C-alpha cells in the first residue's frame, strides 16, 4: 500500500479470514536487498538517479547493438576459443559472450531505460477528486462479476486507487493470452459503488500498450525457470565484458605506443 500523499510502497499483514491487522506498516523494500533495489533503480538519488540509470541503459543499448554489428560475421568463429595467449582467449571469449548475450542485454536495457525515463515523455497524473468506496462492497462479488463479464480472466492482484470514476481495479491475465505479456496486463475497473466502468483486454490493446506490457517479462526473463537462469547469466556478462574489453583496449593502446 501507499500512504495518502506519499510515494513509497509499504507492506502490512492482515488476517484473510477475520480482517484483523497483524502488523505495522513497513517499507516494501527494506534491508540489504531493498537498498540494492533502490541503487539499481535510481542510485538513491530520486529523479536525478533515474536519469543517470536511464541514460546508462541507452548507452548499453548502443554498446550491444554496435558490438553485434562490428562482429556481424560471428557465425564463422562463434564457438572458437583459443588458449595460446591470454589476449587471444580474452578476444574470443569477449566476442562469443557478447554475441550470445546481446539479445537479452538489449531487451533488459530497453525496458529498464523506458521505466527510468518514461516520466520525461508521459504527462504527470491528474489530481482527480478521490472517490469513496462503499463500506458494504464485497471484493468477492466484484471478482465474480469481473469473471462473468470477462471470460477467462484470472485475478493477479487488486488495486484500491480511488480517483475519478475508478475506485477498484482488478489486475490479471487471460489464460490464452500471448506469453510475452505479464500477469497483470489486463484490468477491470469498478467505481466506488461496484459498477463496472471499464474492461481493458491486452489482446485488444494498441501496439504501444502491448509492447509496454511485454517489458516486464523481457526485463526479468519471467517466461519460465530456464529463462530466469539465462537472464541471470546474461546479467553477469557485462562484468566479464567490461573487464575483458578494458584489458583488450589496454593491450592495443600499449601496442600502438610501442609501434609509434
Please place each PLM-identified region on the residue numbering.
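Conserved histidines in hydrophobic membrane contexts and catalytic metal-binding motifs
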Residues: 1-260
